[in-house]
């Protein structure tokens, strides 16, 4: 568990390379705790390195009164993409939940680019953009198939919670899984 020192580290700018807007400023306990992952390069399409992809299809009950996917449903798509990504690197979110602990999304920013309609097929792309001792930073994209039209960009942060739902350090075996994934997907900028 982190020990309080009574000092506050300055806010650290975290820049997500796919967003042209101002950087997300996240307060961190120490500027040395953030570890950016070098596992990605923004190339788009199926050639994106370090990215997990899952194809889905819009269901009628996900639509709003205007005939497009309700904005709240996109967060569900993102969560599903996160869970599937975690499973591919050996982390089963259901098992974590049954143990009484949780990996909880504490921040999620979504930029809507275009709507999805009933029957549209799309791909959710998820990648981890960085980690610290207590946080996981991720980026997600939704593209409409078959033409890869950008639908959504999202960025977020997840924290590990203990059985009392208090934030704690991410267990070493989880950090190890991320490290292993990073080593497998290192690319040059």
UniProtKB/Swiss-Prot annotation:
Transit peptide: 1-48
GO molecular function annotation: fatty acyl-[ACP] hydrolase activity
GO cellular component, one term: nucleus
Protein name according to UniProt: Acyl-acyl carrier protein thioesterase ATL1, chloroplastic
InterPro entries: 4-hydroxybenzoyl-CoA_TE (IPR050563), HotDog_dom_sf (IPR029069)
Subcellular location, principal: plastid
Keyword Hydrolase found: yes
Protein family (similarity comment): Belongs to the 4-hydroxybenzoyl-CoA thioesterase family.
Organism: Arabidopsis thaliana
Taxonomic superkingdom: Eukaryota
Pfam families hit by this protein: 4HBT_2
Function: Acyl-ACP thioesterase involved in the production of fatty acids and beta-keto fatty acids. Can produce fatty acids of medium to long chain (12:0, 14:1, 14:0, 16:1 and 16:0) when expressed in a heterologous organism (E.coli). Possesses thioesterase activity toward lauroyl-ACP (12:0-ACP) in vitro. May play a role in cuticular wax synthesis.
The enzyme's E.C. designation: 3.1.2.-
Active site (record annotation): 64
Entries under SUPFAM superfamilies matching the protein: Thioesterase/thiol ester dehydrase-isomerase
Tissue: Expressed in epidermal cells of stems, in the top portion of the gynoecium, petals and trichomes.
Gene3D superfamilies in alphabetical order: Hotdog Thioesterase
Subcellular location: Plastid, Chloroplast
Major enzyme class: hydrolase
A single BP term in Gene Ontology: lipid metabolic process
UniProtKB keywords: Chloroplast, Hydrolase, Lipid metabolism, Plastid, Transit peptide
Matching PANTHER family: 4-HYDROXYBENZOYL-COA THIOESTERASE FAMILY MEMBER (PTHR31793), NOVEL THIOESTERASE SUPERFAMILY DOMAIN AND SAPOSIN A-TYPE DOMAIN CONTAINING PROTEIN (0610012H03RIK) (PTHR31793:SF27)
Hydrolase recorded as keyword: yes
């Amino acid at each position: 568990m982190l020990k309080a020192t009574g000092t506050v580290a300055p806010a650290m700018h975290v820049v997500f390379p796919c967003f042209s807007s101002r950087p997300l400023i996240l307060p961190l306990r120490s500027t040395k705790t953030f570890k950016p992952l070098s596992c990605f390069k923004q190339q788009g399409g199926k050639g994106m390195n370090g990215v997990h992809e899952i194809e889905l299809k819009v269901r009628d009950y996900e639509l709003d009164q205007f005939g497009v996917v309700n904005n709240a449903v996109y967060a569900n798509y993102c969560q599903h993409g996160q869970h599937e990504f975690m499973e591919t690197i050996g982390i089963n979110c259901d098992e974590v939940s049954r143990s009484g602990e949780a990996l909880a999304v504490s921040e999620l920013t979504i930029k809507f680019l275009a709507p999805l309609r009933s029957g549209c097929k799309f791909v959710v792309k998820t990648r981890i953009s960085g980690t610290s001792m207590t946080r996981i930073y991720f980026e997600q994209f939704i593209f409409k198939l078959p033409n890869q039209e950008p639908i959504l960009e999202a960025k977020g942060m997840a924290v590990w919670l203990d059985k009392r739902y208090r934030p704690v350090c991410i267990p070493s075996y989880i950090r190890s899984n991320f490290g292993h994934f990073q080593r497998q997907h290192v690319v040059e900028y």
